[in-house]
Amino acid sequence: MLAHKASHEGVLVAEVIKGHNRVYDAKTVPAVVFTDPEIASAGMMESECRAKGFNDLLISKFPFAANGRAVSMQETEGFVKMIADKKTHILLGVHIVGPEASNLISEAALAIEMGARLEDVALTIHPHPTLGETMMEAAEATLGHAIHIIQKPLTNGKSAHL
């Protein structure tokens, strides 16, 4: 399930042997489980964030049930969970359970690799209606201004849909 990781590491080793200066950051390697629904993850889990000293976190889940494309596909089970540093809004982890999670996680891996902030993801226009919109909506929810779900107010950095 991590053939993509092994392939990337092989290329990296070959480039280092050739004398190229390369950097490898394992935190951005996406993990995917091809179940129904699919499960995908990139970056850190909440417990890992806290273990690394990120104690003030913004965390939210956006349900696929609130996404038009998921509804039209009758694939509404699951969510996109985002974890970010409360002070900087830098995205630390994304965890997806739901339709096409294996494809959606790539945007999260790129955002984490780039050091993107929640605002970067939230302000990126996503085509409508697509499952990809769940990434934008999850970022908006994590910032506390989702428009397609009713949110409880942010408490202790956590937000949840009602």
Q: Model segments located where?
A:
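Rossmann-like dinucleotide/flavin-binding elements
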Residues: 1-28, 89, 130
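Flexible, glycine-rich terminal cap/loop adjacent to redox cofactors
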Residues: 18-21, 31-45, 50-162
